A protein has these predicted regions:
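Basic- and aromatic-enriched surface patches that contact anionic nucleotides/nucleic acids
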Residues: 1-106, 201-206, 212-226, 230, ...
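C-terminal subdomains that position terminal phosphate/3'-OH groups for nucleotidyl transfer/ligation
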Residues: 93-242
Length: 242
């Protein structure tokens, strides 16, 4: 059998780990077998990736099916946990965007060399505070599954977990929005699902709470995009306030 191996000869006149990482990053990208998160794993070894990967080892993520054998093998659970971290760092909803995930892995790799003027307007962080807050929100959702086990199977869908997580984060930074209600959320979730697939151009259905319709539409199609995530948040906020 014949094999082709990429070979790159480099001469380093100085000790530069970042340069070496860039070389291996190019080689890994040319291999065309690694997904984006696996490439990050090969390139970074600082605070952000260490935090995300260590967090992924918690059994809680297996309990709610965020971590499964298939997802873990491709590091998709780590990628999703990275999104939760970014939501926490920015205190706002973000759409699924590989570029901003890459930016966070780079900017928060070495916290001592953080770029205050970064193009993403990402803030400098207190790593201990971020970990503490992450643990608080995780425990809050864990307690919800104990309060009502019906929530647990819903969480295997990343969009549901992200919707709850981002709402909890935002409500703690905005006292004007209604508090999260597990009972109301499960009603919203189940009633929205009962509608089946609703056309995105439908504004309302006769006799149906409009928030059910809005949540249903935002939960379909490209449901990890920013507009859909915000639409689910707005439907939750309106429903909790009723």
């Amino acid at each position: 059998m014949n094999y082709v191996f990429p070979v790159e000869f480099i001469n380093l006149p100085f000790d530069n780990a970042a340069y070496v990482n860039d070389v291996f990053d190019r080689l890994n990208r040319n291999a065309k077998v690694l997904n984006v998160q696996e490439l990050r794993h090969a390139k970074f070894d600082g605070w952000f990736i260490t935090t995300a990967e260590e967090e992924a080892s918690d059994d809680f993520w297996k309990e709610c099916k965020i971590s499964t054998s298939k997802r873990s093998n491709r590091m998709l659970d780590v990628q999703f946990i990275s999104e939760l971290l970014i939501c926490l760092i920015k205190n706002e909803i973000i759409g699924f965007d590989q570029d901003i995930i890459d930016a966070c892995y780079s900017l928060y790799d070495d916290l001592d060399e953080f770029d205050d003027g970064n193009e993403w307007d990402l803030p400098e962080i207190d790593p201990d505070d971020i970990k503490k807050r992450f643990a608080i929100y995780k425990e809050a959702i864990k307690n919800m599954t104990r309060e009502n086990p019906d929530l647990l199977p819903c969480l295997k869908d990343n969009k549901t977990f992200y919707s709850i997580w981002s709402y909890l984060v935002i409500q703690d930074n905005d006292a004007t929005i209604p508090r999260f209600s597990l009972e109301k959320y499960l009603t919203l979730y189940s009633e929205a699902n009962k509608l089946g697939r609703v056309d995105k151009d439908v504004a309302e259905l006769p006799g149906v709470n409009p928030q059910y319709v809005k949540y249903n539409i935002a939960n379909s199609g490209a449901n990890t995009e920013y507009p859909q995530r915000v639409a689910r948040f707005e439907a939750m906020k309106s429903f909790f306030g009723e």
